[in-house]
Design a protein with these regions (language model features):
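Beta-strand elements of repeat-based all-beta scaffolds
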Residues: 1-152
Length: 152
């Protein structure tokens, strides 16, 4: 393993761009592999919705491509419900994931680009009682009643 000298990392600034809501919309880090070489900018970009939730993100790898190729996808795109729950997330690295929520905001079902389907069942107190993946129950949860305190 090659250990880089600390001189390579000295005097490398970090620039941060914030919007009026104090959300970081861009950060620019600088990279150099040999002391004395010019710095190369590495830009990370975020876009937020009106509620301040991150909806689009690009790392330096795809940000630099997006400047020359208009059709370059973002690393991560998230769609939120009106209540603020992430309904759909799309990632160039991990694929897509769809979440279906219940009336109380609990996760009922999720599926992803790999074909994994996950179902959650809840009791009357909205505590999860079972998790089913690909049609098979993979988790069962049980909770003690109010009268169980006597036995502890």
């Amino acid at each position: 393993m090659k250990v880089m000298s600390s001189i390579v990392h000295s005097n490398t600034p970090l620039l941060v761009v914030i919007d009026p809501r104090a959300l970081v919309v861009r950060s620019v880090q600088f990279c150099r592999t040999v002391a004395g070489q010019p710095l190369a900018a590495r830009v990370t970009h975020q876009r937020y919705d009106r509620a301040g939730r991150p909806v689009v993100g690009r790392d330096p790898r795809l940000f630099s491509r997006s400047e020359t190729e208009a059709q370059t996808p973002a690393n991560r795109v998230v769609r939120f419900s009106l209540s603020g729950a992430a309904l759909l997330s799309e990632s160039v690295d991990s694929g897509w994931r769809l979440n279906l929520m219940g009336e109380a905001g609990q996760l009922l079902e999720s599926c992803d680009g790999r074909g994994t389907q996950r179902l959650m069942e809840y009791d009357s107190s909205l505590r999860p009682v079972s998790v089913t993946e690909q049609g098979l129950v993979v988790e069962r949860l049980a909770y003690g009643g109010a009268d169980a305190a006597e036995h502890n």
